[in-house]
């Protein structure tokens, strides 16, 4: 009898396991959630082998258990010759791989000189706790962490009780669950996905949450501007992780057709860049950008070669040939490379995403204007006081900021972002005027408040609003929020608002399980309620693309007080009203967030910058850094002009500054001041005339852009674009060109003569967009090297042969004929180092 009973138990176990060690029938969809909930160490089949996870209980009675799969490889380790290369798919492994402990973090220098102003406040305020998450570092760091719920979360149960309807198949365990992949921030230099436990978000929202490690700093973003080191390896790691999820997440009960990427800070910038990249097309459907976009000054590196040369010089790899230099860098230890102090210009980055013509095909704002992100639903927002770390250094005491400190901070801000001598005075005084509370101008606390608003508006608010507007211009779904709450923590100034990164504990449900080492807050019931609200919005968006559906806001099971969010309907953002949701203890839907200040940065400041360029065309500007790796000896035939093209050589070795960037001084002013009065009158009259012309051009350009948008949205019948995302077609024989393309074609023909500048031939006749003009700087640098090769769409294997010359937005532009004074003419739009 006992033998019969044993056989029956074994048969029942085999049926419960689905006939295989992975918990799913061979060839079936994968592990059933019932098996996940019953086994302590469940095993799942993937395309590369079996992985064993661990079931964990959460410290909250309303949350069910979660199975964690920690350290699942999504790519081959980028070691040896694979350093500075796109990631490859992981190799298969025999047997069962344990996925029960966190993987190593990617190499980084947590105690380096990276400016704290760009890091989240919880990171800098708890640096010792953050260091414990990155003590175990290795170049073999390309791993995912998966958090899979084992039963329906409280949102599903609450919905069923409230509506008395049958369970919604979209959010029950009988259907595939939405997937949310989190991209961590840290200025592309620091951080790890291990810091973010997705268990509460997964259990409460009934979604699968994934975090990942991707290559950082020099190992993730070093670029020489040519095929020796193309850059953007960190972005390609994220794309490879998305490929892995699309291929394998069904085995864990996830839906590969409902993948949402979300991130904060630099992670949000990566979200924005992945939206614009054709490499990630079809790999995800929705995106959430928390406190970051691709058009902030710190989002994209427009001087990659400059910092690569500085690093190479520091470690003894300063070679004349870029390939030799990269090979030398490959032979160095990761620790030696990461520990080098290569300081970026303030408000910028030394190693980060670059416009390579492939992964990032063009300037992100140009791609947005072309409608390259039409296929994605988007949720984007900012925190009330993002710029806290910018102001703390200027706050001399609890009494606020003195008048002299205010003036110095604004001057330093203008110097670091714009750098030109005469025009900065006008811009500096204009900024001071706009951010002075004239009703209480002598109040130090008010000066501190307006200074905080200045940095928040410039670095976060204006770029976020511009991004949302560009998205909404094409009638694509976008929701905008502002976050107005932060937890009570020691060391936080009483005057501080919700700073950079303060939304993260609420997104990941930390208040529901209590304080952690990274978030040592005194969480109240209000914090728990607000966290439930945020998780409901975020997971609703992942399920349907609408944060209001399918689960209504209701937290009576958490808080005895009524939830004010129950009566709020989060409206879509549109280009006219610009509606947004105020997320705080007193929620409300409003419109036109900080409209005056946003218009100041997006409209007036670029206009002032353009006026300066026109007025001071006689100013000789120093040559910028090149974008290709050139020999250190200057080429023959180089001659100076009023507006010199980017040279083919770097300054002499003695001119390379290995320390923090310092802007070079311009030649002295040689104007004749004997007739100051007449010159002043003449300049004043000229300014008036130029203002009239500029504003007339502005209104004309707005009308013109609206007309072009209508043409993009309503193409002529029978003429498909043939370009993903609605990009422009190439002029081809036998096809009638639209007026704007015909104009560019005529310019190309007209500029093809001997001695013509190809860069001028490729430049559109219409004036540059004001928000693009805002990013002009004295050391403008075009980015795409003429010899750059495209990456394979899969990111695997050797590069393909060079494609034929093309102006396709996803391919490289044809290089100019080599000359002694040739420079990078490969982009149709100029790029710069300074952004909104």
UniProtKB/Swiss-Prot annotation:
Its primary localisation, in coarse terms, equals membrane
Region described as Disordered: 623-661, 711-735, 791-836
Membrane topology according to the record: Single-pass type I membrane protein
Q: Where is the composition biased (Polar residues)?
A: 824-836
Q: Membrane side Extracellular: which residues?
A: 15-678
Its recorded name reads Neuroligin-2
Q: Name one GO molecular function term.
A: identical protein binding
Q: Which residues lie on this side of the membrane: Cytoplasmic?
A: 700-836
GO cellular component terms attached to this protein's record: axon; cell surface; dendrite; dendritic shaft; dopaminergic synapse; excitatory synapse; GABA-ergic synapse; glycinergic synapse
What is this protein's tissue specificity according to the annotation? Detected on hippocampus neurons, especially at inhibitory synapses. Detected in retina, in the outer and inner plexiform layer. Detected in pancreas, in islet of Langerhans beta cells (at protein level). Expressed in brain, spinal cord and dorsal root ganglion. Detected in brain, and at lower levels in pancreas islet beta cells.
Q: List locations, semicolon-separated.
A: Cell membrane; Postsynaptic cell membrane; Presynaptic cell membrane
> What's the name of its gene?
Nlgn2
UniProt modified residues of type Phosphoserine: 714, 719
Bias regions of kind Gly residues — which residues? 717-728
Please provide an example of a Pfam family that matches this protein in its UniProt record: COesterase
Q: Where exactly are the transmembrane stretches of this chain?
A: 679-699
Mind listing the GO biological process terms from this record? gephyrin clustering involved in postsynaptic density assembly; inhibitory synapse assembly; insulin metabolic process; jump response; locomotory exploration behavior; modulation of chemical synaptic transmission; neuromuscular process controlling balance; neuron cell-cell adhesion
Report the function annotation for this chain.
Transmembrane scaffolding protein involved in cell-cell interactions via its interactions with neurexin family members. Mediates cell-cell interactions both in neurons and in other types of cells, such as Langerhans beta cells. Plays a role in synapse function and synaptic signal transmission, especially via gamma-aminobutyric acid receptors (GABA(A) receptors). Functions by recruiting and clustering synaptic proteins. Promotes clustering of postsynaptic GABRG2 and GPHN. Promotes clustering of postsynaptic LHFPL4.
Q: How does it assemble?
A: Interacts with neurexins NRXN1, NRXN2 and NRXN3. Interaction with neurexins is mediated by heparan sulfate glycan modification on neurexin. Interacts (via its C-terminus) with DLG4/PSD-95 (via PDZ domain 3). Interacts with PATJ. Interacts with GPHN. Interacts with MDGA1 and MDGA2. Found in a complex with MAGI2 and IGSF9B, where it interacts with MAGI2 (via WW 1, WW 2 and PDZ 2 domains). Identified in a complex of 720 kDa composed of LHFPL4, NLGN2, GABRA1, GABRB2, GABRG2 and GABRB3. Interacts with LHFPL4; leading to mutual regulation of the protein level and synaptic clustering.
* Family, as annotated: Belongs to the type-B carboxylesterase/lipase family.
The annotated regions of Pro residues compositional bias extend over: 796-819
Enumerate the Gene3D superfamilies for this protein: alpha/beta hydrolase
Keywords of the record, alphabetical order, are: Cell adhesion, Cell membrane, Cell projection, Disulfide bond, Glycoprotein, Membrane, Phosphoprotein, Postsynaptic cell membrane, Signal, Synapse, Transmembrane, Transmembrane helix
Identify the stretch(es) annotated as Required for interaction with LHFPL4.
679-699
Q: Mind telling me which InterPro entries this protein's record contains?
A: AB_hydrolase_fold, CarbesteraseB, Carboxylesterase_B_CS, Neuroligin/BSAL, Nlgn
Would you list which residues are glycosylated?
Answer: 98, 136, 522
């Amino acid at each position: 009898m006992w033998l019969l009973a044993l056989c029956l138990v074994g048969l029942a176990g085999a049926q419960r396991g689905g006939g295989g060690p992975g918990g799913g029938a061979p060839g079936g969809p994968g592990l059933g959630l019932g098996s996940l909930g019953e086994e302590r160490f469940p095993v799942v089949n993937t395309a590369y082998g079996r992985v064993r996870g661990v079931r964990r209980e959460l410290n909250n009675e309303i949350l069910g258990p979660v199975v964690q799969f920690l350290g699942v490889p999504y790519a081959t380790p980028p070691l040896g010759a694979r350093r500075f290369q796109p990631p490859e798919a992981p190799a298969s492994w025999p047997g069962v791989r344990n996925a029960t402990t966190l993987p190593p973090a990617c190499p980084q220098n947590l105690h380096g000189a990276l400016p704290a102003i760009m890091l989240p406040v919880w990171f800098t305020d708890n640096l010792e706790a953050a260091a414990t998450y990155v003590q175990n570092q290795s170049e073999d760091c390309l791993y995912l962490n998966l958090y899979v719920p084992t039963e329906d979360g409280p949102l599903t149960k609450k919905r069923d009780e409230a509506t008395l309807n049958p369970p919604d198949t979209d959010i029950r365990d009988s259907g595939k669950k939405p997937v949310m992949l989190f991209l961590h921030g840290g200025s592309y230099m620091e951080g790890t996905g291990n810091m973010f436990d997705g268990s509460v978000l997964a259990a409460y929202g009934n979604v699968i949450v994934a975090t990942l490690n991707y290559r950082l700093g020099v190992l993730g973003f070093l670029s020489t501007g040519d095929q020796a080191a193309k850059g953007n390896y960190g972005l390609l790691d994220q794309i490879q992780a998305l490929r892995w999820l699309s291929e394998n997440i069904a085995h864990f009960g996830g839906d590969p057709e409902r993948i949402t990427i979300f991130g904060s800070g630099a992670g949000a910038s990566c979200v924005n860049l992945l939206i614009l990249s054709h490499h990630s097309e079809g790999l995800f459907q929705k995106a959430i950008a928390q406190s970051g976009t691709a058009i902030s000054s710190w989002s994209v590196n427009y001087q990659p070669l400059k910092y690569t040369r500085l690093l190479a010089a520091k470690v003894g790899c300063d070679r004349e040939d870029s390939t030799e230099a990269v090979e030398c860098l490959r032979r160095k230890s990761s620790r030696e490379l990461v520990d080098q102090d290569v300081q970026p210009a303030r408000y910028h980055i030394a190693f980060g995403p670059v416009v390579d013509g492939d992964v990032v095909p063009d300037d992100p704002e140009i791609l947005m204007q072309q409608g390259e992100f039409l296929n994605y639903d988007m949720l984007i927002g900012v925190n009330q006081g993002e710029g806290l770390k910018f102001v703390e250094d200027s706050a001399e005491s609890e009494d606020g900021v003195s008048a002299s400190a205010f003036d110095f901070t604004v001057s330093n801000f203008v110097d670091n972002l714009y750098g030109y001598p005469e025009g900065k005075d006008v811009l500096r005084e204009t900024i001071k005027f706009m951010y002075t509370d004239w009703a209480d101008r002598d109040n130090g606390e008010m000066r501190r408040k307006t200074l905080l608003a200045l940095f928040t508006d410039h670095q976060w608010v204006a770029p976020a609003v511009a991004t949302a507007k560009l998205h909404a211009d094409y009638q694509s779904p976008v929701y905008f929020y502002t976050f107005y709450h932060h937890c009570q923590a020691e060391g936080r100034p009483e005057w501080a608002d919700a700073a950079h990164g303060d939304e993260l504990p609420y997104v990941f449900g930390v208040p529901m399980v209590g304080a952690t080492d990274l978030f040592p807050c005194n969480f109240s019931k209000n914090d728990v309620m607000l966290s439930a609200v945020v998780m409901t919005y975020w997971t609703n968006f992942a399920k349907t693309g609408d944060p209001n559906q399918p689960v209504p806001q209701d937290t009576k099971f958490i808080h005895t007080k009524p939830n004010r969010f129950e009566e709020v309907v989060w409206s879509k953002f549109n280009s006219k009203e610009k509606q947004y949701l105020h997320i705080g203890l007193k929620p409300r839907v409003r419109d036109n967030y900080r409209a005056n200040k946003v218009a100041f940065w997006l409209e007036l400041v670029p206009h002032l910058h353009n006026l300066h360029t026109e007025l001071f065309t006689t100013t000789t500007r120093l040559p910028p850094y090149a974008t290709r790796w050139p020999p250190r000896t200057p080429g023959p035939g180089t001659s100076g002009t009023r507006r010199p093209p980017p040279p083919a050589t770097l300054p002499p070795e003695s001119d390379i500054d290995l320390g923090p960037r310092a802007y070079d001084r311009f030649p002295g002013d040689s104007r004749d001041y004997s007739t100051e009065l007449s010159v002043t009158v003449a300049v004043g009259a000229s300014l008036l005339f130029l203002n009239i012309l500029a504003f007339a051009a502005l209104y004309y350009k707005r009308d013109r852009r609206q007309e072009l948008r209508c043409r993009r949205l309503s193409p002529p019948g029978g003429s498909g674009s043939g370009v993903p995302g609605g990009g422009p077609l190439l002029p081809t024989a036998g096809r009638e060109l639209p007026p704007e393309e015909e104009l560019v074609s005529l310019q190309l023909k007209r500029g093809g003569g001997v001695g013509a500048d190809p860069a001028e031939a490729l430049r559109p006749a219409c004036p540059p967009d004001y928000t693009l003009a805002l990013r002009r700087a004295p050391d403008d640098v075009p980015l795409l090297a003429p010899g750059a090769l495209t990456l394979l769409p899969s990111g695997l294997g050797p590069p393909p042969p060079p494609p034929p010359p093309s102006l396709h937005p996803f391919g490289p532009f044809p290089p100019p004929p080599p000359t002694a004074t040739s420079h990078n003419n490969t982009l149709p739009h100029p790029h710069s180092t300074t952004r909104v």
